[in-house]
Amino acid sequence: MEFSIANLQPKERASFALRALYEAAGCRKYHMGRFEEYGLYQENRSFLSSEQVITFTDLDGRLLALKPDVTLSIAKTAQPTPGETLCYYYHENVYRPSAESHTFKEISQMGLEMLGAVGEAQVQQAVCLAARSLDALGAEWVLEVSHMGYLLSLIHISEPTRPISIS
């Protein structure tokens, strides 16, 4: 049987499209294990959408957690040198409480992180990648940019392929 992207499920096609987009932009894939030391999440509770985290004691006695977030792990392990900008993308499962069912849910999440020397050019790249990501998914979309400085710099980068409205 010959491989064809057309035979993939929509989620798989989306993942391939976004991976190609991010790698073409120079981002590297970040992969982490399922578990992270609970202390990382305890120290950064205000960053998380919920303080509820699935924890367990590992065989060596460390308190571990099923990851509720990927950004914190990337920030902890990716250490850019002064002046360096690192760009990572990820496709990971995270574990978060569901308000509707009052249980934990496993959520497939794909995202992009820029760390280090992040200036105007990197912000422009990230926002453009966000728009291109939404476009690659094929549905109608609206990208809201809430910082006027970012918005003005985006207007100056190139001719938009979509109309830009400022309200």
Q: Can you annotate each of these PLM segments?
A:
Residues E2-N7, R13-A14, A20-L72, K76-S158, ...:
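Extended, charged alpha-beta segments that form solvent-exposed binding/catalytic grooves
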